[in-house]
Amino acid sequence: QVTEAGASDKAGTFVKFKPDASIFITTEYKYSILATRMRELAFLNKGITIILTDRRHLNEDGSYQTEIFHSEEGLKEFVKFIDSNREPLVDNIIYINTEKNDIPVEVAIMYNTSFNENVYSYVNNINTIEGGTHLTGFRRGLTRTLKSYAEKTGLLSKLKFDINGDDFREGLTAVISVKVQEPQFEGQTKTKLGNNEVVSAVDQAVSTMLEYYLEENPKDAKSIVNKVILAATARHAARKARELVQRKTVLTGGGLPGKLADCSEKDPAQCEIFFVEGDSAGGTAKQGRDRRFQAVMPLRGKILNVEKALVHKVFD
């Protein structure tokens, strides 16, 4: 029963929770985990103030350990906090705050000079560590918009190989927050969003705002696209090196001598191999061959003409 206690300028609710030892294995709270969660909530709900106080232990001065979490810029400050130890690629933060298909969508994007992708996604303030449809929509909108801009401006004209979605997300830090009335959670730990309608909502929100940002900030856009090209080039070079090692492993594993000068063509039907007598002839043949499809292998000793030789000579 609620009774009137008198006039007050304060309002709110106290919620007390004590873990049941018969259900929970551990009943002692870890301050660091609670602090991380309170900080997240302050970033996700800009303007609110959260005070965390640990009254289990007293400090030397007789006070309790206390932290105050407050953010005026929300997700913008969140990505700055995540990237605090990284060098930014561009100074501006790409910020999106809109509503698509009755779904509020808020996204903050920042590129840095590292090679890692750091994307955090939330639904109704719940950390969806397994991702879900909102993350799918974000990646789709980001990749399509950046690729379209790069092709339209001719920045990809000299690239001789394709780029993929991973290249666009190298050095990317982003926070995605959506509000869904009836969220459907999937996955083993129920931390993956399954609402299909969220894909198009986030996709549209990201592509619309990102397209506008790229047009208004051509210098930043060029830096981001150049970062993408660098990532694609590194990935392509790594794949080539890996294939070369695998190819050499196959050849050496098959018992072929190390003196074989292989060709670069992978299709056996398009390749030729020349067996030459001795290292001297092998060196001359290597200089005159087309290394794209012609391989040369020097043989030790004199080659026997089996058509004219006696049978016992052939098998000697």
Annotate each language-model stretch with its function:
Residues 1-315:
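GHKL-family ATPase ATP-binding module
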